[in-house]
Amino acid sequence: MSTAVAEFKPSEKLLKTRNIGISAHIDSGKTTLTERILFYTNRIHAIHEVRGKDGVGAKMDSMDLERERGITIQSAATYCQWKNHTINIIDTPGHVDFTVEVERSLRVLDSAILVLCGVAGVQSQSITVDRQMRRYNVPRVAFINKLDRTGANPFRVIEQLKEKLKHNAVPVQIPIGLENDLKGIVDLVTMKAYYFEGKDGMDIQEKEIPDDLKELAQKKHEELLDAASMFSDELTEALLEGTPTEEMIKKAIRTGTIELKMTPVFMGSAFKNKGVQKLLDGVLDYLASPVDVKNKALDQNNNEEMIVLESNFEKPLVCLAFKLEDGRYGQLTYVRVYQGKLAKGMTIYNMSNNKKHNVGRLCRMHSDEMEDIDSAEAGDIIALFGIDCASGDTFTDGKLKVSMESMFVPAPVISLTIEAKESKHLNNLAKALNRFTKEDPTFQTHVDQESGQTIIKGMGELHLEVYIERMKREYGVELITGAPQVAYRETITSKADFDYTHKKQTGGQGQFGRVAGYMEPIPLEETLDYDFVNKVVGGAIPREYIQSVDKGFKSCLERGSLIGFPIIGVRCVINDGAYHDVDSSDMAFQIAGRYAFRQGFNKANPQILEPIMKVEVDGPSEFQGAILGSLNQRRGMILNTTEEDAYCKTEAEVPLADMFGYSTVLRSSTQGKAEFSMEFSRYAPVPRNVAEELMKKYKVNNKDED
């Protein structure tokens, strides 16, 4: 992954830039860590806690809702200076319902800090975040946080990093004390002890390693050298000669990290102000600068051939809009500059629609505050004003016609109906929906053609709750909401033939088209919703009407015959047909295709699929029975249970349909001491009794159509 940029000597500024994300499972302490980083780098002058008594809330949680709920909902951007380096930071949500915020951040970052709780270790969302980091080849360091908490065990977390995430996790530090006795860390590169004293841990004392830790430190130091030497012949030779230097060790660790073959592990407690400054040193020492990362784009003038972009401000401009926000300053577009230079007054072109825009105002963001700048270069993350675009659009200065691959957007799994309490708010509701769907690709809306109701879709209950609350606060729209609906799907389980002739004579030109073939299931693991195969020979269906048949098939996918939900996992093969010289037309073959599909679908043993969620529940061991009982009652399949230090962790797969209201049940059955997280896992067939109930309900609701 690491690459030298040909014939271009990168500027000092580029080499001293780090674009990093801070990601983790909810409540691992990401936002608290970011708050400390901003404090130690003098970006803020007082520390405010996420759920602090002062009511101010963390700097990066700028939305009122974030401060009230104590969670991060949107990714927030800021930058700071540390030891002559510029660090652009994006603090991302840990809750799985806001996973697209993590996705869009990692798409434009060069590196990341994976924050893990020293007690809970690797949790479900840690696994999701790690998978997202792999998708975008993001090098990372791990920070084991909360080592001041009862039950903290960093070495157990390192084993989980190796086993659950398959990381080559190597500690570069060990803690001095744990829980209430946490005093500092031992640096395994310098082999010195560091204590964080004085107000807010500002006074860093370097001392010799305590006697009771010398043996462990030496053992871990040797393990670190052994791991790092895999990435440096120079270090290997120096080890044989007994002369390794700090610089050699750091250089080798950096190479392994950037090549995604090693994860250096840091330790501390952000809340107790211990270890954060040394983590910042690690960001500079081990994480990638823009020069170290190979970014690619698709050349639109050359069959979308992949080209490599250079972090060179003298080259033609290429930048990516990765996030939209409609704040108090109007629409903001967050942009990562990959190549070239972006300046006020420039004309830039949106590669998705060839629209040109004039750059009126450029800013660096600091959470919800901004600082005006005149220009930005390759490697910078900044914000533009007044640019109408969508998330994932590529901009150039017109000299290149390239587009960057957009980010992965997961499909929504939950929906509900909404309507404004008062008709005078309809205009504001439309504005809110338009804005939110533009900002967040996982928040979707449509009007049901039959009922005329507005339906919103999202990643979970909390996701939709937050948008409903934002409509009320930001647009003054009070909503009446229906019960949450599960995003069921329909599919087929066997192969079935179809042969349908559409014939209509009404005087003048009639309609004629015959479509024959078969449909078969696509295995769910292939994650392909639909496949069309043309095996017609001898001109039984003229070439110009093949696409008409495909259109007819596709029109049926939106609404299955069992319960009216979208159809997935169907391969349609046409192998015969017939046409009429006068009466055949595009519309005739579309209609024939539609009826042929329905005929085949009803014969192919259709079934209903439901979303299955991966659920993880953490709580005191005394409530394990209550937790298992609550999951079993919800058709849950227990995958794994672990118990350590009077805490139990339960992993299960549970149908989404049975998870509504689970947070209330869990709270009451565990005296509010347990918490859970869930994320979409897969689609699976619903049991027969559930299917019958769903079909019965669908028939009652649609009896007027019959």
Swiss-Prot record:
Superkingdom assignment: Bacteria
Q: Where does GTP bind?
A: 24-31, 91-95, 145-148
Question: Where does it primarily localize?
Answer: cytoplasm
Q: Which CDD domains match?
A: EF-G, EFG_III, EFG_mtEFG1_IV, mtEFG1_II_like
Molecular functions (GO terms): GTP binding; GTPase activity; translation elongation factor activity
Q: Which InterPro entries match?
A: EFG_II, EFG_III, EFG_III/V, EFG_IV, EFG_V-like, EFTu-like_2, G_TR_CS, P-loop_NTPase
What is a single cellular component term in the Gene Ontology annotation? cytoplasm
Which UniProt key words apply to this protein?
Cytoplasm, Elongation factor, GTP-binding, Nucleotide-binding, Protein biosynthesis
> Residue limits of the tr-type G domain?
15-291
Looking up Gene3D superfamilies in the UniProt record yields: 3.30.230.10, 3.30.70.240, Elongation Factor G (Translational Gtpase), domain 3 (3.30.70.870), P-loop containing nucleotide triphosphate hydrolases (3.40.50.300), Translation factors (2.40.30.10)
What the protein does comes down to:
Catalyzes the GTP-dependent ribosomal translocation step during translation elongation. During this step, the ribosome changes from the pre-translocational (PRE) to the post-translocational (POST) state as the newly formed A-site-bound peptidyl-tRNA and P-site-bound deacylated tRNA move to the P and E sites, respectively. Catalyzes the coordinated movement of the two tRNA molecules, the mRNA and conformational changes in the ribosome.
Q: Which family does it belong to?
A: Belongs to the TRAFAC class translation factor GTPase superfamily. Classic translation factor GTPase family. EF-G/EF-2 subfamily.
- The identity of this protein, by name, is Elongation factor G
Give the gene that encodes this protein.
Answer: fusA
